[in-house]
Amino acid sequence: MENKKNFYIDGKWVAPKSKQEIKVINPATEENCAVISLGNKEDIDYAVSSAKKAYSTWAFSPKEERIRLLEKLYENYKKRWADIAAAITTEMGAPKDFATKLQAGTGAAHLKSFIRYLKNFEFEKPLGEHAPNQRLIYEPKGVCALITPWNWPMNQVCLKVAPALASGCTMILKPSELAPLSSMILAELIDETKFPAGVFNLVNGDGETTGNALTSHPDVNMISFTGSTRAGALISQNAAKDFKRVSLELGGKGANIIFKDADPDAIERGALRCFRNSGQSCNAPTRMLVEKSMYNEAVERLKKYTEN
């Protein structure tokens, strides 16, 4: 069982202030695969303080410097692709081929996309032909709290971390305590890439203690959260106290709705989409509503398909 108790704060791996720990379970084997620490308010205070300090210089870093570092991060990511995929297989039970091609692959794709977008983005430009002397200026928001789910670890992490780095924000990442291992590899890559200390920080933990301390911290300017509707509501309450900007992606699990005149393969296709990613995707159609007249047929076809 791996020891993954340390956090990445202020450009180094540090021992947590918290003494609370949790075991990470491989859902495919139901065996313990690692132990992590659950951060407390002191750990969050340290991480936010480091991010706030780094923001004073990172926010004004040249676009060319951010591009250089992101391109280096992308190259380092590709070198550890297999390690990232293996970590995802371990922490969430994803099949190896799926973890390699899609789970780790989407993380790399997001990095590449935001690098391309940053190269073409203008942080300052004329407001328009009607106001040639007025400027439209885009500024980084500040210290960001990034909280990600367990079902698409690198997809969600890179989708939040990459644009934050590109825009000049600093951040504290709290990955899901159920699937933190791939995120810790990303922290290693950011360290290897030599981003300035404090720009990126990682604190593992749960929602009740760690997440609450992070989203209610007065020096956090923005929160990006993907997860449950209940947690999103609590985060919104914390954010409202000092008007933090909030980006929420909540809920999921929509139903298949299939009528008698639907595509003949709709039932089998719905089952395939249900089981993809071990059934853990937010858009996995894990409920199937069918026209009453074809209920028995649908049950038999699903049974035959899933037994194959």
Regions found by a protein language model. Name each.
Residues 1-132:
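N-terminal Rossmann-like NAD(P)+-binding subdomain of aldehyde/semialdehyde dehydrogenases
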Residues 30, 66, 88, 111, ...:
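Residue-level signal for inorganic ion chemistry
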Residues 39-42, 91, 102-106, 177-178, ...:
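Short beta->alpha linker loops
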Residues 40, 73, 77-80, 84, ...:
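Hydrophobic/aromatic residues within well-ordered alpha-helical segments
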Residues 48, 70, 85, 107-108, ...:
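A general structural signal for well-ordered alpha-helical segments in protein cores
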Residues 55, 59, 74-81, 85, ...:
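Structural signal for hydrophobic packing residues in well-ordered secondary-structure cores
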Residues 123-266:
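Rossmann-like NAD(P) dinucleotide-binding subdomain of oxidoreductase/dehydrogenase enzymes
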Residues 230-308:
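ALDH superfamily catalytic-core signature
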